[in-house]
Amino acid sequence: MTTSGLDPGAGSGALGGEELRLPRGARPERYELLISPDLSSGRFSGVARIELEVLLDLERLVLNALELGIEAPELRPGWASAGDEPGEPRSLAIELDEERQEAAFVPTSGTVAPGRYTLSCSFSGVLNDRLSGFYRSVYVDDEGVERVIATTQFEETDARRAFPCFDEPDLKAVFDITIDEPEGMLAVSNSPELSSTALAGGGRRVRFAPTIKMSTYLVAFVVGPLEATPAVDVDGVALRVVHRPGRGHLVNLAIDAANHALRFYRDYFGLPYPGTKLDLVALPDFASGAMENLGCVTFREALLLADPEHTARAEMERVVEVIDHEIAHMWFGDLVTMRWWNGIWLNEAFATFMALCCEDDYRPEWQVFVSFARRRASALGVDGLHTTRPVEFPVRRPDEAAAMFDVLTYEKGASVLWMLEQYLGRASFREGVRRYLARHAYGNTDAVDLWEAIGAEAGEVPVREIMGSWILQGGHPLVSARLLGAGTSGPPTLELSQEPFSYLPEPMDNPLAERDEGRSSGIGSSWLVPLLVGGAGGERPHRVLLGASPERVEVERGAPVVNAGGSGFFRVGYDAESLAGLLASFGVLRPLERFNLVADTWATCLAGRARLGTLAEVLSHLGDDPDPHVWSVAIGALGLLDTLAPEVDRPLVAGAARALLLPQLERVGWDPRPGDDEQVPMLRAGLVTALGTFGRAEAVSARCVELFADEVAGRAVVDADLAGAVLAVVAYHAGQAELDAILARYRAPRDPMDEVRNLSSLGRLRDPGLAEQVLGLCLTEIRSQNAPYLIASMLSTREIGPTTWRFVEAHLPEMMDRFPANSIHRVFEGIPGLGQVDAAGTPRYADQVRSFLDSAIQGARRRLVAQSVERLEANVRLARRLPAELAELGGLAPRR
């Protein structure tokens, strides 16, 4: 899955810290489910027959169930699937515990002795609108008619909302699913259709083939007005895309990418795909980005369906990455599954890393590992906070696992796997993964099982100890490099040492922060750092395992690169001599090395370890760097400075942006050229966005307004790679007419990508009155899956952030009712943009924001919001420094 799937706040309540697990006196073997959705009434009913093995003499059978009506329970000895003769049924009473989300089936007399039994019952429920469990997804078709799809999202613990079950990941079973498909509708599930019979009132009863043994959170069924593409045979696997009618022309990229992924993973893992079909299902309403249900992967439409002629390169890259991520889960997560929710990070981190490997094989020219550096930077940003957490931490209750669906799980987890792979070598790492999957297929594991398998291929490298230091404690180090003996006749020596990196020197008074065992900071003290140390220009790197004590390594003359290749998850601080050498050799560094040098410099500025003059010196060496990701660090830094600077100093930031960026836009031009590098469109878009907004380049903003007007009038179509940038600039300068035009395009989009692009641009508005209109739509018209992200974007925009914050204060209860529970905390990721201070250095908004959130946010989501509060404090402290440092940006221009 690409984002969270359960309410992070659900853990609050009377049960407190009690471990919430099912008794282990019985295990399921097989579920036979009949599911009958009624799309018109918004309800469903069903029948469950669960073959289970009772291991102990039991007074009750305890399963999970939530928001279900359960009737007619009975228990019979024997399993029909094993050919057992059915025994006499025993009647059962039902005791529901809503707080524990359990249903106890209690014999009316006696106990249940060990043996094989079949538990049967009927059940019913409501197709909810919360995008979890068995829920409704609604869209309006081309004739203006509202259409309803019934679909599922069960991770982490919402299968219990659809049918009674043993809803824990290690209680795997076979699922034999039958669905009553209304007339004119299509039903899909995890397995291929096996047979169907006509229903008396119209429609079909469709039975699907039994699945492999799998966890309940991977079960899926989707019913509605849908179409499926003809199946493509991929080495015996039937591949389809399922979509709403009229969108079949948008599936080619998905089919091509999935075809490649199935073959790539089969070869990489050395195991066949664990099934015979794979449906990729595009849904209008979906809280997560996508979900790895075995054989029936569900997606947001904009992350699956794309028109290549109207899709930017970066957008196509994202679509392929999500597809590759979910298909990787078919092996790593579905075939082999974590034992308990504390291990969900490994499923997601490994799928994130493998998606990069797969996509890099699919389109090497995209340089996806360089693209990933931007996402890794987000993880480093959170991990430099005292409110960070270990990647893996104890989970007593399933709902606590929801706090793991963040950049630390996905991006930090993937980054440390990549760091390990680069240190060991790809072949050794892959053989370890193959060993792990082969040994644990169809079973459940802990992370140490993977470390042991990789360690068996790693020689003397202490894999388990290295990974434990990165996974079981929060934070990351600043690796300091000091060059010794550079002026002597012998080879120079590089002295390496480490210390914890943090944006604030000490933890702030953060009422939302959790204190772990008396520790005020979630950042660890030292790590086993697998370093690759090389020279500028690609010298073969040395392997150095840096512990708590400093290490010295001989290096060749020239500029040393501590994070050679750029795969390490840490910051690097160079002494003045080493930094000067790297800047002199900047053009021969690899793209990731250049990215890291700029990003690490900016991070040390944010942390108060360096002044803006140091950043300006590094940025002046970018020259004509061709990589858009390197430039994105500079653009992001200047954008934040514009957000936080005193109003009187904002022209200085704008001038620095124009001096640095305008020569690059002149170099790449506005229009695609024959022979353009794959990176040029992304660079052009980033430059136009920055210059047309905080860069205050009037000619750029005027050109964007003209391009938008021509497209609205039907005179031209903006190039797909530039469309998002043009919209961002137009929204930044928008009046009522421009807002109306953007909303009209949002309501009648060309394709799902166009819808998202128009909606996202609204976060750039600067007129508070226009912002209020859009905020009102977030509670009515804008899909609940998208609204939290838009509000966060609006919070982070200087001119409308205060207006947006007042809206959040006034409407938070409504937002909590309407938005998916797993994404409400996303709203508050925008509050660091409220870090402005007055002339005396007093925060304009931060104190009231912190006070409100302390009283308004409850449960496990406080941990996530606490991180945003700490980022806000870091921005406040940066804002206090700016009057004294912004002049150091004066005259900034690239050296050539």
Language-model features, listed with the residues they occupy:
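N-terminal, polar/Ser/Thr-rich
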Residues: 1-45, 79-80, 144-149, 169, ...
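Hydrophobic helix-coil surface modules that form long, contiguous segments used
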Residues: 46, 152-157, 164-324, 353, ...
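Glycine/proline-rich low-complexity spacer/linker segments in large multi-domain proteins
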Residues: 13-23, 112-113, 120-176, 224-229, ...
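Hydrophobic alpha-helical and helix-loop surface patches within well-folded domains
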Residues: 1, 10, 149, 208, ...
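Surface-exposed beta-strand/loop patches in extracellular or lumenal glycoproteins
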Residues: 49-68, 176-182, 497, 501-532
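Long, ordered, helix-rich scaffold segments
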Residues: 376-378, 495, 534-544, 549-896
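Beta-strand-rich interaction surfaces with strong enrichment in secreted/lumenal proteins
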Residues: 34-36, 92-94, 106-111, 162-166, ...
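A surface-exposed beta-strand-loop module
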Residues: 67-141, 201-202, 549-557
